A protein has these predicted regions:
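The conserved acidic donor/metal-binding loop of glycosyltransferases
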Residues: 1-5
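Conserved donor NDP-sugar-binding/catalytic core segment of glycosyltransferases
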Residues: 8-40
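Conserved nucleotide-sugar donor-binding
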Residues: 61-75
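Hydrophobic helical membrane-anchoring modules
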Residues: 90-146
């Protein structure tokens, strides 16, 4: 996620987290923010926050922080063209909780501005559903990048 940048206070926040012994038992994620101030961006940010909190599904563009022991216990990243972050967090949250880091991670709006943001979010949700149903990852990757 090369288009994402952390906010100014991220180092201080991460130090507070990693200094606590219990923090290694959780996957951590930042607050997803899109740089441009548009209503549809704020709606998407709210949807991401709700999904992350209630469904325990933060994705890679939220800057996942995972202790190496938890990472390896969960099997690490699978060799997937797409959905590798979803695959990892799904395995982690079967036994462990994902917790919010109260700091922002800013994502460029380029990929979101190329198409209607609502249509893009729906397309992504459909791709995730197909992935969970076992569709071929190569076909899903082609569909994602089309």
């Amino acid at each position: 996620h090369a288009d994402s940048r952390l906010g100014e206070r991220w180092v201080k926040s991460l130090l507070q987290i990693i200094q606590k012994k219990s923090s290694k038992d959780f996957a951590w994620y930042f607050d997803f923010k899109i740089k441009k101030n548009k209503l549809e961006n704020r709606i998407l940010e709210l949807a991401v926050a709700l999904r992350s909190h209630f469904l325990q599904r933060p994705y890679g563009d939220q800057g996942l922080l995972i202790h190496k022991d938890l990472y390896f216990l969960s099997g690490g990243f699978s060799d997937l063209k797409i959905m590798e972050d979803l695959d990892l967090i799904t395995r982690i949250t079967k036994k462990n909780k994902a917790k919010r880091i109260e700091e922002k991670i800013f994502t460029d709006d380029i990929k979101w501005s190329k198409s209607n943001i609502i249509n893009r979010a729906i397309k992504n949700a459909r791709l995730r559903r197909k992935w969970r149903q076992g569709y071929d990852i190569d076909k899903l990757s082609k569909e994602y990048y089309s």
